[in-house]
Amino acid sequence: MSITRKIPLVLMLLSSLSFAQEVNGEKVFTDYCWGCHHQTSVAFGPSFQEIANKRTIGEIQGHIIAPKSTYKQLGHKRSVMPSFKDKLSQDELNAITKFIMSYKSKKDK
């Protein structure tokens, strides 16, 4: 096989590997969040819809990583949310944040 035929094949292979490694925010939700949060209604913790409508991406990520350091700044009296600093990769953190923000009301987008 000539080099001109190999290059497109290699590029296709690399792009498919990259696509396969994309982190799914809904999977992160089911793995870590669903026990306390629901997408649109209050469970033990606030709904993703409420969070998305009240918080910035930075506030959401900060609270996921260090809830004990951020809860007062966010107007809460206490937080029982565990830290996910050592549990989530940056890709997982970005994916769950994007998933949460997908519940933001259309009028607020």
Predicted regions, residues:
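N-terminal signal peptide c-region/cleavage motif recognized by signal peptidases
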Residues: 15-20
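Hydrophobic alpha-helical targeting segments used for export or membrane insertion
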Residues: 9-13
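Sequence/structural segment immediately N-terminal to covalent heme-attachment motifs in c-type
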Residues: 21-39
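Gly/Gly-Pro-rich "capping" loops immediately C-terminal to redox-active cysteine motifs
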Residues: 26, 38-66
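Bacterial N-terminal signal peptides that target proteins for export
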Residues: 1-8
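Axial heme c-ligation environment in periplasmic c-type cytochrome domains
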Residues: 44-52, 67-109
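Processing junctions and N-termini across compartments
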Residues: 14, 27-30, 75
